[in-house]
């Protein structure tokens, strides 16, 4: 990392010298992410460097290239310092944890913004290092809608950034959605704990290792949602091992986090896993304009409920055997938040 790092806050400027990565009292994903890179990639680099800039409560327009915060330009200045000290350094990716303010701002074009962010970073970092390799963007899904009081569930599109992050992943091969965050612990309405930051960094490392090896990273997400009669069957990609409903690591949610809506006011009478597909049984034949959502604005609102693990959430995960290098916790792939039409 750079001196005074790993991440500069607000207007703070990091030093220009490189030093050992150590975490401040408010932990970043940096240490666990870089440790995971060194442990998990097929050909580990001689050195892994992590740096960045953060400013809480800022939307994309403030943080983007030319934005009012100057955050983007500080990251590029940091990159120039690193390249001056390590002339052979190249960038393998940009990690981003963002989306809450754009959710509050009802930014329905956030997927387009993420594509612009990736393209700008790739162009400008390539200009610094001289590399021709792609520089993908790794993101996670905002998981604090309920913490901000959004609890209307499937009925309305609100706090859209969490859905837009999934759109960006599906639409752009250089944007990788690592995971949701409802399975992590929060210390207030929107911020995860230090231990959760360490776990999140390990999730980033998992995704990075797949991409670095030339593979295609997929979070656990739906690929098809098909209705027939009074049932909806959902197929998934990104699964390692069998699907499971886990009400131990994530507090039990109504219908395991799934919700349904159509013009005939059908309701869910059962949710089950059959042959690693989720089958939703309804109170009657599927009506017009059917929708299914998962972990979407379905929690109890406010900071206290977010901290208690009762915010927006779901219980669907896979059976990945990967474990945390810090505490041995299983790094299951948890299903992303979604709200989609039934075919």
Regions found by a protein language model. Name each.
Residues 1-343:
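Cell-envelope and extracellular/periplasmic
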């Amino acid at each position: 990392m750079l001196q005074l790092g790993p991440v500069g806050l607000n207007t703070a400027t990091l030093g220009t010298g490189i030093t050992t990565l150590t975490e401040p009292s408010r932990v970043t994903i940096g240490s666990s992410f870089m440790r995971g890179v060194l442990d998990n990639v097929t050909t580990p680099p001689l050195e892994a460097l992590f740096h960045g800039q953060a400013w809480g409560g800022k939307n994309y327009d403030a943080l983007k290239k030319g934005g009012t915060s100057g955050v983007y330009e500080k990251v590029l200045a940091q990159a120039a310092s690193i390249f001056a000290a390590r002339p052979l350094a190249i960038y393998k990716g940009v990690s981003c944890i963002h989306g809450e303010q754009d959710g509050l701002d009802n930014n329905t074009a956030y997927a387009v913004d993420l594509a612009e962010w990736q393209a700008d970073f790739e162009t400008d970092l390539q200009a610094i290092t001289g590399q021709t390799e792609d520089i993908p963007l790794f993101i996670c899904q905002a998981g604090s809608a309920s913490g901000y009081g959004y609890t209307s569930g499937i009925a309305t599109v609100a706090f859209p950034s969490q859905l837009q992050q999934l759109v960006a992943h599906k639409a752009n091969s250089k944007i990788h959605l690592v995971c949701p965050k409802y399975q992590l612990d929060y210390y207030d309405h929107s911020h995860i704990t230090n231990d959760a930051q360490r776990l999140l960094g390990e999730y980033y490392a998992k995704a990075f290792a797949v991409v670095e090896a030339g593979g295609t990273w997929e979070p656990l997400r739906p690929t098809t949602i098909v209705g027939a009669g009074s049932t909806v069957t959902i197929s998934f990609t990104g699964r390692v091992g069998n699907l499971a409903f886990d009400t131990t690591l994530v507090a039990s949610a109504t219908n395991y986090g799934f919700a349904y809506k159509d013009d005939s006011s059908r309701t869910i009478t059962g949710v089950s896993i059959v042959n690693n597909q989720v089958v939703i049984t309804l109170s009657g034949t599927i009506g017009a304009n059917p929708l299914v959502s998962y972990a979407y604005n379905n929690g109890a609102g406010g900071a206290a409920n977010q901290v208690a693990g009762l915010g927006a959430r779901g219980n669907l995960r896979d059976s990945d055997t990967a474990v945390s290098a810090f505490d041995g916790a299983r790094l299951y792939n948890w299903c992303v938040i979604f709200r989609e039409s039934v075919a």
